[in-house]
């Protein structure tokens, strides 16, 4: 039997100012649009904006 798709998917988030990426999960139902979060970038050593990529 095939199981149905869950609501949580794994996404990549890329820094807008460097090449650093984070991987995280998001709920499709609660966040149907692309995420934008301020996270710590270790290459720049400061918080920058991260955007969800495909």
UniProtKB/Swiss-Prot annotation:
Q: Does the keyword Ribosomal protein apply?
A: yes
Give the UniProt family note. Answer: Belongs to the bacterial ribosomal protein bL33 family.
An annotated GO cellular component of this protein is:
cytosolic large ribosomal subunit
- What does the UniProt keyword field contain? Ribonucleoprotein, Ribosomal protein
Q: Which GO molecular function entries does the Swiss-Prot or TrEMBL record give? A: structural constituent of ribosome
The domain of life is: Bacteria
Its name, as the record gives it, is Large ribosomal subunit protein bL33
InterPro entries named in the record: Ribosomal_bL33, Ribosomal_bL33_sf, Ribosomal_zn-bd
Q: List the GO biological process terms.
A: translation
Keyword presence, Ribosomal protein: yes
Which organism encodes this protein? Roseiflexus castenholzii (strain DSM 13941 / HLO8)
């Amino acid at each position: 039997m095939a199981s149905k798709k869950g609501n949580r998917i794994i996404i990549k988030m890329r820094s807008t100012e460097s090449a650093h990426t984070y991987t995280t999960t998001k709920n499709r139902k609660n966040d149907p649009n692309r995420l934008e979060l301020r996270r710590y970038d270790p290459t720049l050593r400061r918080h920058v904006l991260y955007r969800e990529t495909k």
